[in-house]
Amino acid sequence: MISVTLLCVVIISYFHYNQLPIYNLDLALKFINNSTQKEDFKSIAEKLGYSSDDKLLVIHADDLGLEESVNSTSFESLKKNTVSSASVIMTTDNTDEVANFSDLNPSLDLGVHLTVTSEWNIHKWGGILHDKDIPSLLNNKNHFYWNKRKFTKYTNIDQLYNELQAQVDLAISMGMNISHIDSHE
């Protein structure tokens, strides 16, 4: 059985390479299986009732879970509809707040903010998995590397795969209704 993370990475890469929109997993799979042609795609604007020429602005709240102030400000903006969507860093200590908010707001456009770096001076985090299971992703303090250069130099692809899958699995196990996946940094 193919995992959610691997499937998303393959589909997103394929669609990005072919410059195709990705907003519907069933449609994506049909296209990959050659049962749907590019001409059958409607833009997100068209699916929302706008014309194909209309431009839409999506305002996205990044880094939910980082700290209480980020969560409360983002929650307020989501409630007021000044922010359209958000994504949560699953490797922080404040994800319970996001899970509770998600439970109270089931129509929330909430994604997992896949995280494998820890660039903040004040906020440091490691992975969801135990340190011994992802040593290539961590520095000598068991935090993710602070920059992408070290991350790409030392990372073991199997450990990376397992950590990303664990982040998605944790969000689902906490009852978050995940609509998308994006990445930190």
Predicted regions and their residues:
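N-terminal pre-catalytic segment of deacetylase/amide-hydrolase enzymes
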Residues: 3-58, 69
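A short alpha/beta connector and helix-capping loop motif
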Residues: 68-93
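Catalytic domains of cell-wall/extracellular-matrix polysaccharide-remodeling enzymes
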Residues: 156-185
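Structural preference for beta-strand elements that scaffold enzyme active sites
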Residues: 56-58, 83-87, 107-113, 178-182
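Acidic (Asp/Glu)-rich catalytic clusters
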Residues: 48-49, 74-80, 95-109, 127-139, ...
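Active-site beta-loop-alpha junctions enriched in small/polar residues
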Residues: 64, 91, 113-119, 184
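Substrate-binding cleft of extracellular glycoside hydrolase catalytic domains
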Residues: 107-164
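Aromatic/hydrophobic pocket-lining residues that form the small-molecule binding cavity
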Residues: 70-71, 95, 160, 164
